[in-house]
Amino acid sequence: MKMPNTLHSVSISTDFPSPNVESEAADVNEYSSTSKFETLGNQSSTNLGFSNSLQDKWDCWKRDLWSIWWSLSRKATRFYRWLSRSLKWRPVTYETVYPQTYETQMSEPREVTTIVKDLNNGDSFVLNVTEPVDPEFLRANIPPVHRKHLPPRLSLVASPGTIPTRGVVVLEDWINPLLSERCKLLLQSELCNQDSYDCPGYICVYRFEQKNNPSVVLGDSTLIQISRVSDLQRHLREYPKNCAFSRSVLEIFPDPGKTSKPCQVSFKVERLVHKELNEYLSWMQPFTCDSCGSLHENWLQIDSKQWDQIRGVILRWVEYSRVIYA
């Protein structure tokens, strides 16, 4: 009794009439002929179930999104290239930066330069210091410079293609090679120092004598002071008349009677002279004069033999200022 009811319920739920054998065979032949040309993508009207329809839609969306992203990326790349060409930008390249060690730094070639000065027109040259120049090549390209207080040697070190055809002077050649290393370093730092303020002036050497009895107090030695002045007459007028020491001008560098141009960097020349004289001379301790009440400093007590050496030092640095800063 239960079997007919079950069969009857199944037949009702299908809602389709049972086809005959001939029509069913015709449908099978038609489906087999169309399945060769139709695929899952172009059978939009085929009823494949709820889950299969969502998968189809998701695949279509993925294809559309991928095509849109690919098109936009191509357009962005073309726009970046056009903008780089129009603005002359360099494209950003990412390179791997390796940390440098001491061996790699020492193995890499370094470019060392030096600045030299032309004696004729005052032009500056930046030369690459790579290897020593052949003396024959040096003498053939640089004319000899004959001046009284110019250093006798020109230790120019440069590449052969960068040597100028005129006379040049290296700053280290002005330093006395017999000085100590400490004094050489002090002079080199002073030569390389770019002063924010300096003015033309003269290097004046004053001689001091005690008014009461100079020969008894000093004997064969003499008290001198080396300082820069811009107006010599004003310095002589401002010296106190009631001082226990009388002051007179021993010599002026450069000589105003022979040249109309003073020393262009008088403060620098004064410091250079004082630093070099500190090597072999001792300065007197500053003291306050009992008569005039002024402070006397930067005084040297020398003899006649030491004066020739001091004069040569002053002449050399005054000549340096004339050659370099003329």
Swiss-Prot record:
Alphabetical UniProt keywords: Cytoplasm, Meiosis
Domain of life: Eukaryota
Chief location category: cytoplasm
Disulphide-bonded residues: none
Segments forming a coiled coil: none
GO cellular component term of the entry, any: cell tip
Biological-process GO terms, alphabetical: meiotic cell cycle
Span of the signal peptide: none
Subcellular location: Cytoplasm
InterPro entries given in the database record: Meiosis_regulatory, Phage_T5_Orf172_DNA-bd
GO MF assignments: catalytic activity
Task of the protein: Has a role in meiosis.
Name the record gives this protein: Meiotically up-regulated gene 113 protein
Gene name as annotated: mug113
